[in-house]
């Protein structure tokens, strides 16, 4: 009986340790995902503008004959009329634009939660304006390590806003 109880205790300890490691990974993953999303925001804004222009062009002139967006709907073997293809491509483009808008709005709301912070420029400079840490440090009148620490703190706050309690575990 002593041997089986020891085995049970070892299994419980392993499970607790695995849970702890998993929780650390979740918080780290949320931080990294937040960084990826922040880095992508300027490009996503440009892409949205381009997609809106393409949508207007599509509405005025219709789809291009060899467009990838059309071939996706044609190659499955079903015969679709030009109107059905046009409708499908239009819905697809509008869905993509809506998803991009939602992501931009979500990130902008999350960023707004830290905009009043004295070290906000550490976050905006790095992820949104592509400014070097030395230049940010000079503008803020501090060391680059201070910029890094405060940026990490601000990204963590944004991560909590984006991912909720998952970012804390």
Q: Which residues make up each language-model segment?
A:
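N-terminal interaction/assembly modules
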Residues: 1-114, 160-169
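Short amphipathic alpha helix immediately N-terminal
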Residues: 114-131
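Helix-turn-helix DNA-binding module
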Residues: 129-145
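DNA major-groove recognition helices of helix-turn-helix
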Residues: 147-161
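Secondary-structure boundary/capping motif
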Residues: 44-47, 118-122, 147-148
